[in-house]
Structure formats: C-alpha cells, structure tokens
C-alpha cells in the first residue's frame, strides 16, 4: 500500500495540523509562499513518488489565493510523481453559483472550479457539506461529500435544551433540518419562509410551526453576513421562542457579520473549523467552534485504505 502523506496550504493550518495529529503523522514538507509579484510559489521538499497524497486546503477568503495555492500544489505534487492526489477541501468556495437561474447571463462557477481541479491532476475530492450536493456531478473524478451534522448533533444532545424544536432558516434547508430533528430525539420542526430581494439581504416573512416557549435550534450549512440568521432569530423571539441557538458547518462571517451577531438576540452560534475565524469573531462570547478534525481524519484513513465513507454516517 502506498505511503499516505498529508500536505496543507495556508488556508486552514490549524485544522490541517489537528487532522495530522489525529492520524499520528506529520504534515508534509512543502514551502507554500509568494513570489515578489504575488504569484503563488510552491516547492515540495520531500519524496512523494508513488505516495497517496492528501492536500488539506479550504477555498475560503481570500478565495482566489487559496484556490490557486491548491491547484499549484496539486501540479507540483503531480510533477513529483505522486501516486494519487486527493484534494481535501473542508469548505468548497465558488459553490453558490451552481446553475443558471431563468437563463440569466451568469457563469456556473462551481463547474468552472471543478473542471480546474480535475484538469491539474486531482484524482479525488473530499469535502464537507457542499452548498449544493449536485456539485459532485460537476467533477470528472470521485467526490466524497461528508457531513458536519453528526458533530453538531452531538453538541446539541449535550445541551440542556428545553422542549426543543429544529428550525430551517429557509425552504431549501428543510431536508437538513428534518434529518437533524429526527436524530434529536425525533423533535418537532419549523420552517422560516423568507424572500431575498438581493444578494446577502433577506427578509423574514413567515414562520411555519409553533415555537412559543421552546428552545429553537436553527440549522444551516453556512453563515455568511449573518443577516438571515439574526432576522430569523428575531422573528422566532417575537413568536415567543425561549432561546435561539444557531448551528452551521461553515463560518464565513463576511461583511457586517460581527456587528450583526453581536447585536442579535441569538443566544449562541455554534460552527465548525472549516474556515479560520477572525480575531473579532473569536472575541464574541456568543460564538463557539467545534472541530471536524476527527471526522476528516477518519475519512482520509478510509479513503487511503479503500474503505467505505458512507458507512461513517449509517445510523
């Protein structure tokens, strides 16, 4: 069996190190930096010939820089005769444009990035909670999309929730919320129906379900500016919710996210470590982080050993 080696770019060094620790190994020796004009510079400083290589790199902000680091690392390792290269992308950026809406003159950037990664020599992709699961079909290589929900659910079960109800922040998240509700002792579910007049601006319209006097658990795949989340929490409190907890896998926290969350009625925001948090976000008492390192390490081990990934999520 080829030697398994882990490498990492500069996007999520802490998570990459945690994964390496879980696998009782060290991160590979590669210098990932910049030339004087800002271009990405990569040099692999150890033998990888025939190796089973995993590159851990989220394509979060700065998105273009982190994406280029990933593809240049892939090319460097491919030219160094790596046996198999798996791109471990905990947060897959450029995933929001996955279709053309009403024949608008817009790109399908998720497909562009998928083609880009395939063309430079990625043999397989491991990612977490893709914004749209159909993105897996954009790749010409195998994609394993694992879920952060078991980690989030474990935390929910440890909380002393009083008469909980799981809330989907929009219609698109109903499947996710229903799955969480079933595993959270088969609790009830509510849905927030909202309209989005323009990008990153949402308006809460209607709550489907009775939340009065209950602990509400909002679940989503990502938190961007936090505008949707905060308005949802406000609407839930207005309808009599006792406490509001928000759970999401990907903590993007862009724009006015810090102020939005700081001034919101949300009791706690729980996220995973797929994206590094800014110092301002870390300073918020409302925000708490869970690590996906154990789950990612197990997925990497299974891929390397040609074992089932889906078996990780069978209940």
UniProtKB/Swiss-Prot annotation:
Cited Gene3D superfamilies: 3.40.50.2020
GO molecular function: ATP binding; kinase activity; magnesium ion binding; ribose phosphate diphosphokinase activity
Active site: 194
Cofactor remark from the record: Binds 2 Mg(2+) ions per subunit.
Pfam families to which the protein is assigned, alphabetical: Pribosyl_synth, Pribosyltran_N
NCBIfam families reported for this sequence: PRK01259.1, ribP_PPkin
Protein name, as recorded: Ribose-phosphate pyrophosphokinase
Organism whose genome encodes this protein: Photorhabdus laumondii subsp. laumondii (strain DSM 15139 / CIP 105565 / TT01) (Photorhabdus luminescens subsp. laumondii)
């Amino acid at each position: 069996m080829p030697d398994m080696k882990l490498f990492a770019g500069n996007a999520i060094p802490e998570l990459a190190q945690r994964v390496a620790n879980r696998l009782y190994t060290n991160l590979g020796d590669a210098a990932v930096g910049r030339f004087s004009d800002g271009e990405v510079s990569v040099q692999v400083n150890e033998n990888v010939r025939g190796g089973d290589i995993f590159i851990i790199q989220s394509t979060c902000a700065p998105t273009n820089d982190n994406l280029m680091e990933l593809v240049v690392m892939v090319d460097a390792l491919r030219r160094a005769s790596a046996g198999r290269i798996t791109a471990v992308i905990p947060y897959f950026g450029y995933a929001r444009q996955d279709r053309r809406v009403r024949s608008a003159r817009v790109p399908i950037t998720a497909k562009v990035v998928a083609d880009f990664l395939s063309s430079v020599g990625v043999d397989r992709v491991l990612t977490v909670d893709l914004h749209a699961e159909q993105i897996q079909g954009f790749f010409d290589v195998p994609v394993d999309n694992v879920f952060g929900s078991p980690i989030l659910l474990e935390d929910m079960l440890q909380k002393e929730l009083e008469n909980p109800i799981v809330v989907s922040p929009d219609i698109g998240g109903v499947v996710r919320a229903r799955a969480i509700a079933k595993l959270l002792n088969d609790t009830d579910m509510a849905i927030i129906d909202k309209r989005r007049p323009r990008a990153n601006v949402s308006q809460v319209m209607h709550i489907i379900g009775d939340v009065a006097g209950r602990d509400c658990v909002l679940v989503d795949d990502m938190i961007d500016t936090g505008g949707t989340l905060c308005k949802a929490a406000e609407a839930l409190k207005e309808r009599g919710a006792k406490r509001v907890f928000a759970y999401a896998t990907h903590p993007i926290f862009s724009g006015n996210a810090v102020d939005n969350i700081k001034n919101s009625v949300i009791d706690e925001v729980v996220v995973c470590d797929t994206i590094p948090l800014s110092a301002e976000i870390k300073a918020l008492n409302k925000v708490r982080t869970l690590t996906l390192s154990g789950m990612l390490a197990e997925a990497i081990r299974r891929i390397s050993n040609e074992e089932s990934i889906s078996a990780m999520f069978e209940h």
